[in-house]
């Protein structure tokens, strides 16, 4: 009986399956196949609002590859970018704006469309194959609340990956012109996970001596050696130190003094000394004129109101005179050595004694920097350090600067109130008043990762380049910080084209030979030029993945080695992208010898051509010509290999020709 039931049941199931199967093949079926859709993009902003009226472009990777072949030429003699360079230095926006048109292609040929009220646009004619594109969003001309770029404009995607689906793209919002600064304390109140920024050197640059504010944490910089100790320079004030300013000639007309912390010997002329001390809890510098003892200013004492730098390469000291802040003509180099054959690599070095107005070379007497008020820290430097920077010239010709008020900030020595006198959240995200009033949630705030890559790089480049500013200190010419004619910093989200036009002068955009560049006109010699280097790399312009500073650096934390690297500098950070490179095999192929597994990518591709403090105080090697080859302390961000073949009689560097190089490369020809 059971067998009969089983057979009947099995037959019934089989019959039902056949019926369903045949029904699916019937021409009278009521079922509808899933309809295919063309590649569709939906644009929203960081608050989740859909964006209508924006144009979405599919930029062929081949065009970005093509623009990358065009040089970003910088005239080494003038520091001016050529007209042609300014048409190819923004890899996506120069294509979209028609500044560069690859042969047989260009913006007129791109698949594009305008988003509707639902934020969607169909790129109906986009080939859905292996061809790759960067998806770029340009808000409507009337849309002042959003910035161009988008979350899919950094890495190329295939047309096939966009087929038969709606692809989400997110763009950044931006503040209105009336937004105001509120200080990082307000930001961290909601975004507590980013409090790690307190440990970065961006936050530690300006400090009341040994009195970090509640927005500063020096714990990363309290090592046992001087070059790891943020307070190493101030410690020398406490034990007492005398710095001798001298020349090896009879006189000086340039103020280019040599310095030692012990009396110099030999045929020298000592002009003056700075006696460093700490008295009554105050750090002091006494100026004593040795050359002209009758100088009425000899013996003057200035208190150190603020330190400037520290923790890595150097530290300077600032004092208050009247209503302005001035830099004392002294720099501490924690890696320096008084036995160095290079006068710029000693423990203490003079800092612009004459140009800042501290010394009269004609009469060999002290002057006061108030004779050059236009070179005060307030107008010359603070623009790249203060959050919410503002400066004005008063009736006495003094330049008085302020930062955004913040109860946890640094004590301003002139105003007597606490301000955020260092780089903070709003330096890169823009003023936060509207964002805060709207309850956050991505409204009225610049989100760097959703900008075009060139605009994100500009957030750093605004200070990490070396040009002349469009803004001037009254009638006295341009200043060090690249300010506009209103003496304001570039607003986050600004394009490179607008920055060059509005913040750099018509006579100089960037570094030049003798002031920032080595004689090859390419490699950086001075600090804060990392962006000058980086825009020349394949990382910045290529047809695969457009990198920014934040691709390697963690902007919110000190990183693994104090340089805010996102990973270790032992090769793992490089190999996280260059996954197919076997380092030892690569080195062998390039150099013809096995370099060993301990060799680092950065030893060849990020050589320390530039100097901020002392760099290496002793030469790594001396060439056959007798030229000393030193190593700096700032890595070249061109990421190329500085070749020995680039050396000439007029260009002894930039190769930081250390013993590391010399272990395989001879000094012949140097």
Predicted regions and their residues:
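Short, acidic Ser/Thr/Gly-rich low-complexity loop/linker segments typical of extracellular
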Residues: 64-126
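Surface-exposed recognition patches
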Residues: 321-419, 425-430
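Bacterial Sec-dependent N-terminal signal peptides
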Residues: 2, 9, 14-43, 48, ...
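Structural motif
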Residues: 40-53, 59-64
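Primarily the internal scaffold of c-type cytochrome electron-transfer domains
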Residues: 194-290, 301-307, 316, 346-350, ...
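Extracellular beta-sheet/turn segments enriched in Thr/Pro/Gly and aliphatic residues
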Residues: 32-33, 152-178
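Local sequence-structure signature of Cys/Sec-based thiol-disulfide redox active-site neighborhoods
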Residues: 175-189, 655-658
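A short, solvent-exposed beta-strand micro-motif common in secreted/extracellular proteins
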Residues: 117, 123-124, 128-145
């Amino acid at each position: 009986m059971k067998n009969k039931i089983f057979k009947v049941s099995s037959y019934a199931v089989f019959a039902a399956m056949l019926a369903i199967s045949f029904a699916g093949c019937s021409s009278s079926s009521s079922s509808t196949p899933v309809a295919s859709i063309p590649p569709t993009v939906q644009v929203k902003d960081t608050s989740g609002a859909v964006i209508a009226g924006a144009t979405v472009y599919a930029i062929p990777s081949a065009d970005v590859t093509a623009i990358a072949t065009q040089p970003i030429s910088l005239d080494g003699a003038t520091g001016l970018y050529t007209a042609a360079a300014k048409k190819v230095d923004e890899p996506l926006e120069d294509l979209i704006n028609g500044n560069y048109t690859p042969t047989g292609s260009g913006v007129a040929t791109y698949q594009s469309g305008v988003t509707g009220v639902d934020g969607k646009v169909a790129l109906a004619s986009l080939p859905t194959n292996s061809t790759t594109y960067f998806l770029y969003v340009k808000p409507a001309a009337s849309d002042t609340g959003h910035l161009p770029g988008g979350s899919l404009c950094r890495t190329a995607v295939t047309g096939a990956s966009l087929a038969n689906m709606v692809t989400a793209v997110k763009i950044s919002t931006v503040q209105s012109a009336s937004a105001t600064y509120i200080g990082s304390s307000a930001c961290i109140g909601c975004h507590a996970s980013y409090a790690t920024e307190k440990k970065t050197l961006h936050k530690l640059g300006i400090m009341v001596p040994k009195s970090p504010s509640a927005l500063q944490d020096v714990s990363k910089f309290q090592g046992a050696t001087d070059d790891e100790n943020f307070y190493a320079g101030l410690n020398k004030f406490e034990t007492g130190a005398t710095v001798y300013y001298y020349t090896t000639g009879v006189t000086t007309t340039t103020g280019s003094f040599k310095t030692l912390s012990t009396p110099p010997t030999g045929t020298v002329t000592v002009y003056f000394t700075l006696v460093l001390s700490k008295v009554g809890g105050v750090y002091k510098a006494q100026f004593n004129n040795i050359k002209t003892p009758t100088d009425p200013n000899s013996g003057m004492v200035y208190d150190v109101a603020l330190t400037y730098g520290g923790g890595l390469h150097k530290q300077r000291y600032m004092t208050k005179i009247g209503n302005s802040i001035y830099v004392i003509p002294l720099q501490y180099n924690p890696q320096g050595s008084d036995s160095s054959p290079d006068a710029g690599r000693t423990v203490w070095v003079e800092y612009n004694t004459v140009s800042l107005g501290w010394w009269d070379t004609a009469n060999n007497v002290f002057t006061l920097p108030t004779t050059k008020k236009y070179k005060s820290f307030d107008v010359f430097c603070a623009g790249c350090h203060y959050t919410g920077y503002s400066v004005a010239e008063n009736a006495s010709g003094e330049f008085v600067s302020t930062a955004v008020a913040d109860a946890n900030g640094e004590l301003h020595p002139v105003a007597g109130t606490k301000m955020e006198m260092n780089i903070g959240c709003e330096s890169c995200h823009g003023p936060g008043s509207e964002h805060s009033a709207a309850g956050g949630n991505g409204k009225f705030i610049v989100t760097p990762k959703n900008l075009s890559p060139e605009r994100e790089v500009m957030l750093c480049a605004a200070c990490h380049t070396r040009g002349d500013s469009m803004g001037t200190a009254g009638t006295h010419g341009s200043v060090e910080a690249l300010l506009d004619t209103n003496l304001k910093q570039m607003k986050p989200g600004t394009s490179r084209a607008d920055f060059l036009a509005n913040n750099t002068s018509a006579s100089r955009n960037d570094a030049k030979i003798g002031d920032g560049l080595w004689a090859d006109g390419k490699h950086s010699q001075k600090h804060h030029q990392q962006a000058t280097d980086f825009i020349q790399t394949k990382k910045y312009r290529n047809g695969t993945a457009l990198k920014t500073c934040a691709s390697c650096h963690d902007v919110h934390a000190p990183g693994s080695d104090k340089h805010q690297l996102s990973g270790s500098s032992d090769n793992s950070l490089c190999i996280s992208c260059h996954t197919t490179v076997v380092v030892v095999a690569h080195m062998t192929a390039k150099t013809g010898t096995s370099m060993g597994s301990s060799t680092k990518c950065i030893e060849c591709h990020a050589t320390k051509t530039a100097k901020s403090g002392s760099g290496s105080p002793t030469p790594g090697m001396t060439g056959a010509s007798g030229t000393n080859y030193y190593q700096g302390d700032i890595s070249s961000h061109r990421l190329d290999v500085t070749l020995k073949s680039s050396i000439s009689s007029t260009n002894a560097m930039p190769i930081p020709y250390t013993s590391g190089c010399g272990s395989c490369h001879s000094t012949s020809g140097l």
